[in-house]
Amino acid sequence: MLYKLLNVLWLVAVSNAIPGTPVIDWADRNYALVEINYEATAYENLIKPKEQVDVQVSWNVWNGDIGDIAYVLFDEQQVWKGDAESKRATIKVLVSGQFNMRVKLCNEDGCSVSDPVLVKVADTDGGHLAPLEYTWLENNKPGRREDKIVAAYFVEWGVYGRNFPVDKVPLPNLSHLLYGFIPICGGDGINDALKTIPGSFESLQRSCKGREDFKVAIHDPWAAVQKPQKGVSAWNEPYKGNFGQLMAAKLANPHLKILPSIGGWTLSDPFYFMHDVEKRNVFVDSVKEFLQVWKFFDGVDIDWEFPGGKGANPSLGDADGDAKTYILLLEELRAMLDDLEAQTGRVYELTSAISAGYDKIAVVNYAEAQKSLGKIFLMSYDFKGAWSNTDLGYQTTVYAPSWNSEELYTTHYAVDALLKQGVDPNKIIVGVAMYGRGWTGVTNYTNDNYFSGTGNGPGSGTWEDGVVDYRQIQKDLNNYVYTFDSAAQASYVFDKSKGDLISFDSVDSVLGKVKYVDRNKLGGLFAWEIDADNGDLLNAINAQFKPKDEL
């Protein structure tokens, strides 16, 4: 009798048993919506975008009932439901993130749940990454003026000799970061200006192999997405390099807008061919594709140097034709970005870096161009340099110097030219030079006006002759006599023993630019280039040296 009772109780217990605990099988659960080929040198082979990833999961039940219905949970949210007997599932994932995945098995008596396993789905919005926080370095101080644009250029090649990766950029103090530079594919006759830099033309041809001319690409895939850097150094990290760090840094700085700058001094040649609508269409479509692939970007900056010519390639330039092409190009880019906004729900900016030379401003109808542009980055620097040993002057200045009141290459003259064309002052962003330009062997000057003399060539530079980083100027300041021209709002240093003369932006001159921007209700300031600063100049842009109400 007792035996029969125990047998009945055992049958009841079995019939009322919830499923056994599922154990998820081991597997590599790192996925990417944009796959990177780490062996590739050509952009066409570098990336493989996907609309979704298929996350495969299988499980076993080592003891007990296998259940009737199985569920797969991501962070406790159901993402799949099916027959428990299959012991496997495929989940289609369309977004990035790190998810705790569990399997839940159920029957009429209840459910059991597995231990979690981590699923990592990477995408170029960086949703799979931990935020890359900035550690305050050198003289940088926290504090950003939120009422003005505060932007800076970061260069792709800065990770090499300059040893200045993204994690060294004081991003909390910037509203915009401009990534220099994104190239446009094309070989002989299309990118000839690039041949002036040893190896750079050849590097672009490797990256553009198999890619149609006039499509954008990445110039240096190793620096951009393959080089291990802080926060993106794991062997299985899908996006390393500058791009990977920018994705992570943006998570820590959600206010930040990052724009790829297309063109630049030696990469502007292809723009001169875009009077051809077919070439222009190829370019615009490729920019759209680029933004769809690299989701951390917030728009595009066009740095055509320069419509009308007088750029790195003296054989290119047609003032009337380029002026029309520039307007058309901006209109078509803006229309493309509008379509992309409608598709994604995001906001995409279109900006342009332009020369501050009055003669180059006169080529373009900026009143018309501004209809497509959110901001105009006025490159108010490189006015003078060691390309001339007889025409010495301020390489960056707000006003004309007292010793040359007829000087037209000034920030004020450029701003005034744009305002007279009808450009919205709030769209004008004034440039700060985080470097100096200079001469050596300066002689034959009069009345201690060193700029009235003649030079004997470019002075010793930080990375190239005649160009000195602000950081180095500040470090070597005791070797010079420093002068601030308060009338022009410009700075320079001079070493009489060597005749070394450097014109540069100092804290004094940058504060002068800040006042000028505020007084004229301009949109803000930007800098070329952030790796050359020790923090002094960016602090000055953000008005750290004086309260805002004293400006």
UniProtKB/Swiss-Prot annotation:
EC number(s) on file: 3.2.1.14
A GO molecular-function descriptor: chitin binding
Enzyme class: hydrolase
InterPro entries reported for this sequence: Chitinase_II/V-like_cat, Chitinase_insertion_sf, ChitinaseA_N, Glyco_hydro18_cat, Glyco_hydro_18_chit_AS, Glycoside_hydrolase_SF, Glycosyl_Hydrlase_18, Ig-like_fold
GO BP, one annotated term: chitin catabolic process
Parts forming coiled coils: none
Main localization, broad class: host cell
One Pfam assignment: Glyco_hydro_18
DNA damage among keywords: no
CDD domains: E_set_Chitinase_N, GH18_chitinase
Annotated region (Chitin binding domain (CBD)), positions in chain: 1-149
Keywords: Carbohydrate metabolism, Chitin degradation, Glycoprotein, Glycosidase, Host endoplasmic reticulum, Hydrolase, Polysaccharide degradation, Signal
Location(s), subcellular: Host endoplasmic reticulum lumen
Leader sequence segment: 1-17
Catalytic reaction list: Random endo-hydrolysis of N-acetyl-beta-D-glucosaminide (1->4)-beta-linkages in chitin and chitodextrins
Highest taxon of the lineage: Viruses
Keyword Coiled coil annotated: no
Domain GH18: 148-548
Active site feature: 305 (proton donor)
Family: Belongs to the glycosyl hydrolase 18 family. Chitinase class II subfamily.
Stated role: Plays a role in host liquefaction to facilitate horizontal transmission of the virus by hydrolyzing beta-chitin and by regulating the cysteine protease VCATH. Localized in the host reticulum endoplasmic via its KDEL motif, interacts with and thus prevents VCATH secretion before host cell lysis occurs.
Protein's recorded name: Chitinase
